Amino acid sequence: MIQVESKTMTLDEFLDWYPDGYGRFELHDGVVVEMQPTGTHERVAGEFATELGIEIRRLQLPYFIPRQCIIKPIDSDKSGFIPDVAVLDENALDAEPMWKKRSTITKGEIVRLLIEVVSTNWQDDYLTKLAEYEKLGIPEYWIVDYLGLGGRRYIGNPKRPTILVYQLVDGEYVVSLFRENDRIESPTFWISSTNPCP
């Protein structure tokens, strides 16, 4: 992550500022940061998007995976996150006031699943985004820690590649861990192939 702007912004200012077709940026507490994923990070995210897209078609679900969208936390106008993969409910989009103009999601019920692929800034995925997505009521959140970078309290000791599937139960996330050749199971999707992590 690289800080881009020296002044803080609101989400609306950030969306007005966001450069078309250049870079990938998030807003963290008013600070614009450029996300610079590695090739492997992008490959892993792409594998998950492909697998989920196949399942969506096979099951004929009214969902789609946008190329990019911004998730606005429920109680902040100074943050906006771009998940690595988002699965949105096509039928619920009419209820989202910011979608058509800014591809921004403010209501958790529009989202079926979010995936973050862990980078060196793993605390954002395990702490900040986890808490914000839970508050929004997003039913599923997957953390794909393909390098085993997260804290031991999350992925165990010794650290190793892990996929954490958080499911919202009575307003709180409950986690299941998957490793190596485990079949990833979730309430919405079962990825039948082996774990897409390299």
Residues of each region from the PLM?
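Gly/Pro/Ser/Thr-rich low-complexity, intrinsically disordered segments predominantly at protein N-termini
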Residues: 1-198
